[in-house]
Design a protein with these regions (language model features):
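Glycine-rich ThDP/TPP pyrophosphate-binding loop and its adjacent helix/strand module
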Residues: 1-184
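Hydrophobic alpha-helical membrane-spanning segments
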Residues: 186-189
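Intrinsic disorder at enzyme termini
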Residues: 191-221
Length: 221
């Protein structure tokens, strides 16, 4: 889709640049390579950003690719690439901006790999302790991009601990007030609406899910 949108911009002669993001696991899909090859061959204004958080659900990068980096996969398409610290806000900004500027000048696609780490589970059904250690997770604690950028802004005099505290309090207040407001509306939607809005007629699987969930809610009353 990204390559197609970028090509449409080129055909229409606009200055639009398409930026797509993909996980490290997503690069194992064939359309990733097909799209980049197409964009490179026709110099489409496309920028790919790979979020390499080192795990595709539970699959480590070591068994996803034989390449040293994901960024270097761009070599096969004759496109420039760069790997940056994905937890460094400014590094990511500069790398993506340079890629966008290059695409806007008609020089074709670029690939940016943001090397980072997924701190939590992939989903609520995922248990990271099965495939990685607590020590590994803790080694990334101090690399939190929000805390790092906050420290940078404070050191440069653009921000302060007082402003940060006030901002957090204001945001938490807004979240709590919004939650209470929504909660006050009550359950005004029938349960079945969650399952019947996608298809004209519910599929057998959706009907089964609906009945299962209805029974679960009834049992928890």
């Amino acid at each position: 889709i990204g390559a197609g949108l970028a090509m449409a911009s080129k055909i229409r002669k606009t200055d639009e640049v398409t930026v797509f993001t993909i996980g490290d696991g997503g690069t194992s899909h064939g359309e990733f390579y097909a799209g980049l090859n197409y964009a490179s061959a026709f110099k489409a204004p496309l920028v790919g950003v790979i979020q390499n958080n080192q795990y595709a659900i539970s699959t480590p990068t070591s068994v996803q690719t034989g390449a040293e980096t994901f960024a270097q996969k761009a070599v096969a398409f004759g496109a420039p690439f760069v790997q940056v610290d994905g937890n460094d806000f400014l590094a990511v900004y500069v790398a993506v901006k340079e890629a966008i500027d290059r695409a806007r000048k008609g020089e074709g696609p670029s690939l940016v790999e943001a090397y980072t780490y997924r701190m939590g589970p992939h989903t609520t059904s995922d248990d990271p302790s099965i495939y990685r250690t607590k020590e590994e997770e803790q080694s990334w604690d101090h690399k939190d991009p929000i805390l790092r950028f906050k420290a940078y802004l404070i050191n440069k005099g653009f921000w302060s601990e007082e402003e940060d505290k006030a901002l957090i309090e204001a945001v938490n207040k807004e979240i709590n007030e919004t939650f209470r407001k929504v909660e006050s509306y009550g359950a005004n939607v029938d349960l079945i609406e969650i399952f019947e809005h996608t298809y004209q007629e519910m599929t057998p699987q959706l009907k089964e899910q609906y009945e299962t969930h209805k029974a679960f809610l009834k049992g928890s009353e």
